[in-house]
């Protein structure tokens, strides 16, 4: 039980001073120039059932294992942060081993030799979600040189995904573990069947607190292909990319970058501005207001047309552009200033 002195110490240590010097947390995961993960933060991979979320996470882990590039993921962990902890809460030991072999194949490492920097734990057999959580906590705090932690199946660390108290406590744990141990945690969570929202209160909390949220989805025209997109990202967004599954000579199924996936194929599925992600809107609006100046109505419509055409792959007509502007104004993404000019509200919440 903490006393007044404890609270005073915590209060004083929490204060930020204008003369303090801070640097950007070390960037450890990127896709192109986009920052996906830094030490001291956590990210989320989301997608509906069978979208191949675990295959995508396998590529992230493989990149971290070699501190190099796999698919579009580039890892750059400090030498003192090269150990990876992978916790799977859903699969049997047999299927967990297949995931481990897939990671090693992606990293071009032998599958008959224990990897030096990867520890893989299966927690399905543990019935109590709180025990699973405490095991993860113990491993994080008692394993040397940890840099990346993967929790594949974070909903299994709580009894009820719609319990707001449980969700807040679990996300609080993620924030505490990443901050105190200076690590990056990548979690995996299903999307709702009926929409593209992360499931339950835990999905809402992760959505609000995560550094990055990746969305993995089956391609609507080619179901054997999965598309990776930045649903939420603090840095500038990366271009969506796609992968297909291929078998190696020893029958291990791995994801392989689909180089035939093009901008036009990608953007045609998101013609409606209401279907665009936060990062896609932000990209278009940053281009629209690239000059940094207030825009009169006519110039704004012209700039919106060009910017959104680049995002969705084809231009909107005048009626659609007027509807788009009304949408942006209602969302406070664009603000109408004095004298009929418009500005970009970069601090909007989508």
Set out the residue ranges of the language-model regions:
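The Walker A/P-loop phosphate-binding site
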Residues: 2-103, 346-348
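Structured loop/turn residues at beta-strand edges in well-structured enzyme cores
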Residues: 40, 82, 144-145, 181, ...
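Phosphate-binding/switch region of NTP-binding enzymes
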Residues: 44-46, 50, 165-253
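Alpha-helical scaffold elements adjacent to nucleotide-binding pockets in ATP/GTP-utilizing enzyme cores
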Residues: 59-60, 95-103, 135, 170-173, ...
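Conserved inter-motif catalytic segment of the P-loop NTP-binding fold
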Residues: 78-162
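Flexible, glycine- and charge-enriched loops at secondary-structure boundaries
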Residues: 93, 129, 160-167, 200-203, ...
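C-terminal regions of RecA-like/P-loop NTPase motor modules
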Residues: 142, 220-350
